[in-house]
Amino acid sequence: MKNIVSALIVLFCNVCVIQASSLFKIDDNYLSQHDIVYLEPEFDSFNGFPLGNGDLGGMLWFTNEGITLQINKIDLYDKPANGRMTLRSAGRLNVNLGVPCYSYMHLADFEARLSLQNADLKIKSSTPFADTEITSWVDANSNVWVIDCQADYKKTLPSGAVNRISLERWGSCDFGGWYGSRDRDVANGLGTAKVNRQENDIILEEKFEGGLHFTIACRVLKTPTEILRVSDRESSMITPLSSKQKYKILISVVSSNDSDNPTQEAISLLDKAEVKTLTALRKEHLSWWTHFWSKSFVHLADNYLENIYYIRRYLMGSSSRGKYPVPFNGGLWTTNYDHRQWATPHHWNTQESYWGLAVQNDCDLLRPYIETYVNMIPQGKALARKKGTKDGLLITEAHDFSGNMVSANWGNMTTNYTPASQISKIMWEYYAYTQDRDYLRNTIYPFMKEAAEFYLNFLQWDDVRKEFYIYPAQPYEHEWSSKLKNTITDRYMICLLYTSPSPR
């Protein structure tokens, strides 16, 4: 146990140990007090509900007649020949239930409840036109997003009314300059999305100039549908209203990082989910999240702070299980097409998502972060050579996950050397809390060693004062000078690197 800001943190190997503890017992429904509950629909996308499985996810929000999802995936990075590496959205799904089921003017009752414990969202509404229920979750074990829709329509059904499920991708500029600059060519980032159908599925295929391609597949179960091609970039499934409407929507997303044939694999994911049955899929989904929550328990005297702790843990479990680290600037939760400020990752901000994960026994969520930076060792070593050292590596503050050192020549960052050592610190925390010596030896230590070697080669000896010093250097975003001596940030990180023992 550690006392951290009045928090009692107790780590256990599994839930059985918790229940057997003589200290206290945790109610099976303890986490329900941290459910996110709306008693009226939220039409602003940025106030929607986050759902994800660590790789696939996005926000869900309301329209007067249904719901909208922006579908995102952690590895959809476009790498154009001339331009920055940019994380693209996959697309959007719109579900229109045919009547104003969420209109403020017509609501008699409403509740939307995001269960952190089960990683699912349940929505209920009642209007003079219909009583509706929607349940949505992203399978923890496969890239399949499930939306279960039910509607009991009242009195006379509106003539010609239909349920419409639409899949689209329009794309956009990323506006990565944080309002200070923007690409005036609004066609950049649109991609070449095309929709088609294969049997009863809508297939949306996208390919970017940098080589990324991906597929979204959408299937509706339990009700007959007609597929209508709206445009090159949008298709809809239409089903006439009946007094009692029940159907399930399945969405899968596969990228060229996952498969050489994303379309075939996306369809295969839906086939496997259907054969397994959604009941069995959901049981395994709940089992994964039960295990996730059982790995640690936190109680805080301040309920509001405890809410923040658990929603943050939920968000990391929902977004840090893919190929790359969670982007600090929106994660999987962006909603405005491809708009994402600071498109280039800044480590100063990225690291904050990973602070404390090892302590709370979520070391597995550190793996995308660790392995992304280990893959950047060759580029890091090349940059250190340019800075004049024989050995070692450097990671610039602003970079992309392909290893492009974006800020290598920025005046306010050019002699900031600390990101690699900060990365090393988080890597060391993984080992400290797992004691995985093989992973330390084969993955973590090679990076840490090179980060330490840079300082060993770069430090200079002062014959007069009989001490080492570092020059030129600068702290983060130091606009005034890149030629400072003995910056405190470097001194601190040097101490950290050289007090971490090496594997035997």
Located regions from the model:
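Short, surface-exposed recognition loops and adjoining beta-strand edges that mediate ligand/DNA contacts
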Residues: 328-343, 460-477
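Bacterial Sec-dependent N-terminal signal peptides
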Residues: 1-22
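Conserved small/polar residues in nucleotide/adenosyl-binding loops
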Residues: 498-504
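Substrate-binding groove/exosite segments of carbohydrate-active enzymes
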Residues: 47-51, 59, 281-443
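C-terminal, helix-dominated tail/subdomain
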Residues: 471-497
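Conserved functional hotspot residues or short segments at active or partner-binding sites
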Residues: 448
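An active-site-proximal structural segment forming one wall of the substrate-binding cleft
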Residues: 451, 455-458
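Beta-sandwich/jelly-roll carbohydrate-recognition scaffolds of carbohydrate-active enzymes
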Residues: 21-304
